[in-house]
Amino acid sequence: MTEYNWNERHIITFPEETLALATKDLHVYYGAKEAIKGIDMQFEKHKITALIGPSGCGKSTYLRSLNRMNDTIDIARVTGEILYQGIDVNRKDMNVYEIRKHLGMVFQRPNPFAKSIYKNITFAHERAGVKDKKVLDEIVETSLKQAALWDQVKDDLHKSAFTLSGGQQQRLCIARAISVKPDILLMDEPASALDPIATMQLEETMFELKKNYTIIIVTHNMQQAARASDYTAFFYLGNLIEYDKTRNIFQNAQCQSTNDYVSGHFG
């Protein structure tokens, strides 16, 4: 078994004006267990950043901390700063529902509501008091077009979301998330339940979406990270080991552990 120097780090930074999001000294605890260990990380606007690493390394925990989803876990505690538009959204006085409007989440498995395709998109808007049908129709069409689903469902908007394929359901969930106009999309292994064709379609959708959104994606699929991201970050045991342009991570990693992980020789 290879002995690695875990003090070895290579982490890029960006000019302040290009930042969509950043964390400073971010720690996440589940009870007494420290799952994320003081991560400083920056995300560039309108780029796709992939978070990779072995199971249990903390990448999903880190992702869920960015829009305060860990607040839903009783034993979770998050310290440090999560900086969005210069504001620390980890402050206890922040409205987490407002935060999640700006940092939308797409989960591992498609989770459409038990409603029509149309109502999946309009549900949050109607609850917020939007009643004008023309406005709602426009939100639905715009969101589904951005998620590359409109042409497939425009004649079936009032059918159940459960009539869609797995890949279509995931793109519906993306459409639902972007309908509230977030700046950032957080995706936790969004292709793990999809077949290769649906995965390819999802990646093509991501390429289009990054024109308007910043995307942060957790993936176990090295090929997907290499294909679909601009930047890649390697996590291990709650630490950020290496963070660089994706081509550098896969072709010229600075840390031996990173190189071994992406080449399948880790351990």
Curated annotation (Swiss-Prot):
Entry-linked Gene3D superfamilies: P-loop containing nucleotide triphosphate hydrolases
Molecular-function annotations in GO: ATP binding; ATP hydrolysis activity; ATPase-coupled phosphate ion transmembrane transporter activity
Ranges of residues in domain ABC transporter: 21-262
Keywords: ATP-binding, Cell membrane, Membrane, Nucleotide-binding, Phosphate transport, Translocase, Transport
Binding locations of ATP: 53-60
GO annotation terms (biological process): phosphate ion transmembrane transport
Catalyzed chemical reaction(s): phosphate(out) + ATP + H2O = ADP + 2 phosphate(in) + H(+)
EC number: 7.3.2.1
EC top class named in words: translocase
Oligomeric and partner information: The complex is composed of two ATP-binding proteins (PstB), two transmembrane proteins (PstC and PstA) and a solute-binding protein (PstS).
Protein name in the entry: Phosphate import ATP-binding protein PstB 2
Source organism: Streptococcus pyogenes serotype M1
Upper taxonomic lineage: Bacteria, Bacillati, Bacillota, Bacilli, Lactobacillales
